[in-house]
Every structure is written in C-alpha cells, then in structure tokens.
C-alpha cells in the first residue's frame, strides 16, 4: 500500500490557548483514520520553509492537502473582500511549493476543502472569497447540522492513483470560499 503525506495544518495560536507559545502542525485524526483503514501508512508533513519540501517528498507516494484558513486572494490577482477570513501566507507558500514538487515528481495530489481551492489557484483559477458573492444552492455551512452528518452529494472521476475513493458519495462542508473560475486543465 501507499505512504500518504498529509500536509499539516498550522495551529494559529492565541495567547492562553493550548500551545500558544509554540507553533504546531497537525491534521484531523479522521484523515489519518480513513487512510489507515484503507491499508495506507500516513505521515503528517509539517508546514515548513518552502525549500524543505524536497526533503519530505521522497518519503511519500502521494500527498493530501487539507482544509483550513482562506486562500489569499493575492494569489489569484484580487484584493481582499470584506468577507475574507483569516489567511496564512506561510502555509500558502509551502503548499504551493508542495504542489509544484509533487507534480514534477509525478506524485498524485488529493485536495480536500481548502486543498482543492489551492490546487485550483495553482492552475490559474480563482475563488469567490465568500459564498455571499455567488448564487450557489449547495449548503456549504453545516450549522445547525452536526459536523459529522453529510449534507450534499459529490462524484469523483476514477483515477488510478486514487481508485480507492468511491465514485459517488455524500460529504459535509464548512466552506465559505468556493471556486469561481476553474484552473487550466481541471474538470468540474
């Protein structure tokens, strides 16, 4: 089975919260669990200096980009909208470097939530900085529905590298940003 490198999420701390004095990279246990249940080994890769991705990439067969804070609109040529949430330029730079390195090494990439949005931006796409700027009929914010309850359907095109994913299933969503213009070579 494969070794999956999940790019960590920085824990942006505030004083008096756990770890406030240290930077922490983490991932949700559910990401680890799902890949382990499928027989894969998981390594969580810390957000680091962009030049260090070359040291991590040889350790994994595939990478996963997870959710988190908003993708900076500067990356797709827009000014911040009033509804833009927190961004993380260090994470943006590191994950963009990871995408570039993985593509150059022909390693598959799975983008989930923010990860998918960043992949779109990498390929020249843009985002709606907030759902209020689009007419989407999909419920992207779950409240008051519990987080673990799926609320909408998705379909996944079968690719050899991620054939373990089902073709059709339901997912939950916590987005307030969505794809506006699809990146070059991507399919919706």
From Swiss-Prot:
Gene3D superfamilies assigned to the protein according to its UniProt record, in alphabetical order: 3.40.50.880
One GO-annotated biological process of the protein: polyamine catabolic process
GO cellular component, one term: cytosol
Keywords attached to this entry: Glutamine amidotransferase, Transferase
A Pfam cross-reference name: Peptidase_C26
Lineage top rank: taxon: Bacteria
Residue ranges annotated for the Glutamine amidotransferase type-1 domain, each copy included: 17-188
GO molecular function, one term: gamma-glutamyl-gamma-aminobutyrate hydrolase activity
SUPFAM superfamilies for this protein: Class I glutamine amidotransferase-like
Database matches in InterPro entries: Class_I_gatase-like, Peptidase_C26, PuuD-like
Full protein name: Putative glutamine amidotransferase-like protein YvdE homolog
